[in-house]
């Protein structure tokens, strides 16, 4: 999982990527390709 300052590029990397909020942090999850997981500080 990458830690990024901006998730704008992370959510456009794959069409299955979704931006969600968990425990006060913003995550990008991708079920079909978990390589594209990311988190914002």
Curated annotation (Swiss-Prot):
InterPro entries: Ribosomal_bL36, Ribosomal_bL36_sp, Ribosomal_L36_bact. One of its GO terms (cellular component) is ribonucleoprotein complex. GO terms for biological process: translation. Keywords: Ribonucleoprotein, Ribosomal protein. GO terms for molecular function: structural constituent of ribosome. SUPFAM superfamilies: Ribosomal protein L36. Belongs to the bacterial ribosomal protein bL36 family. This is Large ribosomal subunit protein bL36. It comes from Xylella fastidiosa (strain Temecula1 / ATCC 700964). The gene is rpmJ.
């Amino acid at each position: 999982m990458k830690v990024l300052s901006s998730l704008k590029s992370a959510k456009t990397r794959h069409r299955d990527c979704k931006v969600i909020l968990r425990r006060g942090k913003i995550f990008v999850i991708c079920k079909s390709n978990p390589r594209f997981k990311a988190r914002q500080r």
